[in-house]
């Protein structure tokens, strides 16, 4: 679950990290009033969406008058911002962040993620702030400096100083950087985050560090113990199908293809998408119904898949280990009957009660294509989309 920039900066403030004074506004009038609260300009106005690349898309602007603030707010509030990180429809702009402009001398980068290979929280810092860190990693990886947090000791001040020295910081900037490093690490661990990023972390012309931007991603599996973060969730920034799936504890990610996939198990789901592409198809989604699939959840999964107008066929690939294939069959039959499916449905069942599940599908009288294996299933669903 991602947070908006203004929400990230609210958290920064709670932990004593320096950030520009700013206010999130939902109307042009509020935006003008925010400028008055901040004081004399110039100001920076920013569209609040869950996507990077806002500046290049016109969603960030330095303004010198309240009239310009009103014009910016009137232009963007209620509209959709399209960036390189969004789809063609973009993300809705419901808030504008108005904050004091900062005199920038140098831009840095500081962020942290959970590194799966080392099984540690890893901090990354770079002198190349203000650009996508992925681009820096690809083109100039030697400019990214890393430290891993020991899960027993947690963050240590010497690690912050080590990064500061590698960035070429001196004097009071080393102390300020170390404080920010320790604060970010504390936020990351206490708030069950998956990602935290300040890009850019700037050195002002007055010689101080300030968090000019903020990006936070919370671990969705830990939200049950982070009620205040859960309340910050902005579902308008999410695919409505993904939000609906989350309510049923389904793992759903929308993609750009036309073959809907319903699978139990994340690994099998990825393998299913791979074999569909291998045979010339394009998956419309990733959907994992999980090991505890019920008839109701399978029915809901079917509804979510078919709510995508791009879907021209559905592939159901179930391995019955924990889940029983006959229950999955009941869910498929119920969903097809309830929703009124008008696209081909290819089903591959293996494992626990697979034969009983296949018999139920055959006896249902519905237009469901039974596959004899995974390769056969992929070939049949691709052929169905192509009208063969």
From Swiss-Prot:
Top EC class of this enzyme: ligase
Protein's GO biological process: succinyl-CoA metabolic process; tricarboxylic acid cycle
Keyword Iron belongs to the record: no
Pathway: Carbohydrate metabolism; tricarboxylic acid cycle; succinate from succinyl-CoA (ligase route): step 1/1
Entry binding sites for Mg(2+): 199, 213
Keywords, sorted A to Z: ATP-binding, Ligase, Magnesium, Metal-binding, Nucleotide-binding, Tricarboxylic acid cycle
Amino-acid positions noted as binding substrate in the UniProt annotation, renumbered to this chain: 264, 321-323
Gene Ontology molecular function: any one: succinate-CoA ligase (GDP-forming) activity
Binding site for ATP: 46, 53-55, 99, 102, 107
Cofactor: Mg(2+)
A single GO cellular-component term on record: succinate-CoA ligase complex (ADP-forming)
Role according to the record: Succinyl-CoA synthetase functions in the citric acid cycle (TCA), coupling the hydrolysis of succinyl-CoA to the synthesis of either ATP or GTP and thus represents the only step of substrate-level phosphorylation in the TCA. The beta subunit provides nucleotide specificity of the enzyme and binds the substrate succinate, while the binding sites for coenzyme A and phosphate are found in the alpha subunit. Can use either ATP or GTP, but prefers ATP.
Subunit structure: Heterotetramer of two alpha and two beta subunits.
Protein's UniProt name: Succinate--CoA ligase [ADP-forming] subunit beta
Species this chain originates from: Escherichia coli (strain K12)
Organism placement in taxonomy: Bacteria, Pseudomonadati, Pseudomonadota, Gammaproteobacteria, Enterobacterales
Gene name in the database record: sucC
């Amino acid at each position: 679950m991602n947070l908006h920039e203004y929400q990230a900066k609210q958290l920064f403030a709670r932990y004593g990290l320096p950030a520009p004074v700013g206010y999130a506004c939902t109307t042009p009038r509020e935006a003008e009033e925010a400028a008055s609260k901040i004081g004399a300009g110039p100001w920076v106005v920013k569209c609040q969406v869950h996507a990077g690349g806002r500046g290049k898309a016109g969603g960030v602007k330095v303004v010198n008058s309240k009239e310009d603030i009103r014009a910016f707010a009137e232009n963007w509030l209620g509209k959709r911002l399209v960036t390189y990180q969004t789809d063609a429809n973009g993300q809705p702009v419901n808030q504008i962040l108005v904050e004091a402009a900062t005199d920038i001398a140098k831009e840095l980068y500081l962020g942290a993620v959970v590194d799966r290979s080392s099984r540690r929280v890893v901090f990354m810092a770079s002198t190349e702030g203000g650009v996508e860190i992925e681009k820096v990693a690809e083109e100039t990886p030697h400019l990214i400096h890393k430290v891993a947090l020991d899960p027993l000791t947690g963050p240590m001040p010497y690690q912050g100083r080590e990064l500061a020295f590698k960035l070429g910081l001196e004097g009071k900037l080393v102390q300020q950087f170390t404080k920010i490093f320790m604060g970010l690490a504390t936020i990351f661990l206490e708030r069950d985050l998956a990602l935290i990023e300040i890009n850019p972390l700037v050195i002002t012309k007055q010689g101080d560090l300030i968090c000019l931007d903020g990006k936070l991603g919370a671990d969705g599996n830990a939200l049950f113990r982070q009620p205040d973060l859960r309340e910050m969730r902005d579902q308008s920034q999410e695919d409505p199908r993904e939000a609906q799936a989350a309510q049923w504890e389904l793992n759903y990610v929308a993609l750009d293809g036309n073959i809907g996939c319903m699978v139990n198990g994340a690994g099998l789901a990825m393998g299913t998408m791979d074999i569909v592409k291998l045979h010339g198809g394009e998956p419309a989604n990733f959907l994992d119904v999980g090991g505890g699939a019920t008839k109701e959840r399978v029915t809901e999964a079917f509804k979510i898949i078919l709510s995508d107008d791009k879907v021209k066929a559905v592939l159901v690939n179930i391995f019955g280990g924990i889940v029983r294939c006959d229950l999955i069959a009941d869910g498929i039959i119920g969903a097809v009957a309830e929703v009124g499916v008008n696209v081909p449905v290819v089903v591959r069942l293996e494992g626990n009660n697979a034969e009983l599940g296949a018999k139920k599908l055959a006896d249902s009288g519905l237009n469901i294509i039974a596959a004899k294996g995974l390769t056969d299933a992929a070939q049949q669903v691709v052929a169905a989309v192509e009208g063969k």
